């Protein structure tokens, strides 16, 4: 994590046109687990000072890119102390009520969690779109789509099921998913489309990427869950399998889903208390917006070029001053 900066003059200049310069009336929690409003946390003040900003980081590199850039700007421009917290998706939402999480930067739909935490518990509020379009689906390596072009139609998958068998798929074709915490309807899809496949979890985004990379290099049969935005698609342009078209409401019952995933307008979720705190970090989160291409570039810096998240963020921020300045207006 970058060092907490106290350059008040620089911070004030960047925030000059920002809304929400009101006093920070809420004390945020630190890593030690102090509750929201607790005396242990060290923020506060009477001039919109940032204090501690608790940022959830979900387990995929695109989100890591979001968090890297927002954290860098919060520290360099606003003088915040950013506490990044590596959390699975639903665990992060639980943190809104305890004061352990202020913001989630990339929410993929999750209408169920919005109902629970925004509508029912009222511990969270929506903070607008990220600008990213999220696509989830089933993919095969390019070589496979080229040699068997009909494989990109789900109706033909069973014809090739035996080719996808592995030691973990129990005599059925393997459908490889990533982290079990990701948004997925795949088990229901396999069941409801009556496919001779079994969902097997790679365990992480890194493992899923490596499986596709190896499948392309060694011409191995692989059908797997994947998504955009994702830098890896510029390295290996996976071919998407066409599932039954998505229609509004076709995924309303999770057990009966038999359609493709929707295109998600990814959005930001923050704690209700954070939204009303007057913290300039909230204004930054609310105004933060970029494209799939922006995210993929920073993610590539981290995953491929092996830059630290801080260095990757610094490189992108310095190359895109216009976009960054817009977040402070």
Please describe what each predicted stretch is.
Residues 61-80, 190:
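Short, polar/charged alpha-helical segment
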Residues 136-146, 263-277, 300-301:
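A bilobed periplasmic-binding-protein/Venus flytrap-type ligand-binding module shared by bacterial periplasmic
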Residues 62, 182-198, 202-219, 280, ...:
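An extracytoplasmic/periplasmic, membrane-proximal ligand-sensing/linker region
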Residues 58-61, 81-95, 200-211:
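Short helix-initiation/N-cap motifs at beta->coil->alpha
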């Amino acid at each position: 994590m970058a060092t907490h900066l106290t350059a008040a003059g620089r911070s004030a200049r960047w925030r000059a046109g920002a809304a929400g310069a009101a006093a920070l009336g809420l004390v945020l929690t630190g890593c030690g687990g102090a509750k929201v409003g607790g005396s242990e946390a060290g923020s506060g003040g009477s001039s919109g000072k940032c204090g501690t900003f608790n940022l959830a980081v979900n387990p995929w590199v695109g989100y890591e890119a979001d968090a890297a850039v927002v954290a860098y700007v919060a520290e360099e421009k606003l003088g915040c102390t950013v506490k990044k917290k590596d959390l699975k998706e639903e665990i992060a939402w639980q943190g809104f009520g305890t004061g352990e999480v202020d913001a989630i930067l990339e929410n993929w739909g999750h209408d169920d969690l919005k109902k629970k935490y925004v509508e029912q518990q009222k511990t969270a509020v929506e903070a607008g779109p990220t600008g990213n379009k999220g696509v989830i689906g089933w993919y095969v390596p390019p070589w496979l789509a080229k040699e068997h072009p009909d494989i990109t139609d789900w109706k033909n998958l069973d014809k090739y099921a035996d080719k996808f068998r592995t030691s973990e798929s129990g005599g059925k074709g393997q459908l490889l998913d990533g982290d079990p915490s990701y948004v997925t309807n795949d088990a229901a899809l396999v069941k409801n489309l009556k496919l001779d496949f079994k969902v097997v979890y790679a365990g992480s985004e890194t493992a899923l990427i490596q499986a596709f990379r190896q499948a392309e290099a060694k011409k191995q049969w692989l059908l797997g869950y994947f998504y955009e935005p994702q830098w890896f698609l510029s390295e290996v342009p996976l071919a998407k399998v066409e599932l039954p078209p998505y229609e509004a409401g076709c995924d309303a019952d999770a057990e009966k889903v038999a359609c493709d995933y929707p295109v998600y307008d990814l959005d930001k979720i923050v704690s209700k208390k954070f939204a009303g705190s007057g913290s300039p970090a909230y204004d930054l989160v609310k105004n933060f917006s970029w494209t799939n291409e922006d995210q993929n570039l920073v993610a590539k810096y981290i995953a491929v070029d092996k830059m630290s998240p801080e260095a990757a963020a610094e490189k992108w921020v310095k190359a895109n001053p216009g976009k960054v300045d817009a977040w402070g207006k």
